Amino acid sequence: VGSEMCIRDRMDDSDYIARHLVTIPCTIVAAPSVIQRYGTPSRIQQFEELPCITTVNALKGAPWQFVNKKGGFETIKVNGRYRVNSGEMAGRAAISGVGFAILSKQACQPYIDDGRLIEIEFEQSAAPLQLFALYSDRRYLPAKTRALIDFMHQRLSH
């Protein structure tokens, strides 16, 4: 028995059908201690040398993506010496001073507001996180699964 649906970022080479659910804005942050130790980077290419927190699932772990002026993506292979398996763990590591991180803007905003994290802005913004409902076959998708996908799309897009 296989699963009927999963929620994740887009799979590039997949036989699954992907329905976009939500776009989550992201930002680059670091703890004040990291900024004190390494300074504030002025170019995204500096992340190739600076300590960065990467997420195992996102872009297969190492590269970070930024949106360029033309709306396309620029990928930087960062110095990802600390890898985690969730955005929550990346946030905790960033607050602890492990390194620079790309996090969901909404999730880290309280820590930016209270000074535990510093947001670092560049001409190229961090690529947003895209979440999709993935399922194998539209024709045989059970009604309850289709209803769940429709509900999530409606709730997350508002």
Task: Tell me what each language-model feature is.
Residues 11-131, 157-158:
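C-terminal regulatory
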Residues 131-140:
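A bilobed periplasmic-binding-protein/Venus flytrap-type ligand-binding module shared by bacterial periplasmic
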Residues 1-7:
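Short, small-residue-biased leader/transition segments that mark boundaries at the very start
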Residues 104, 140-152:
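Short amphipathic alpha-helical coupling segments at ligand-binding clamshell hinges
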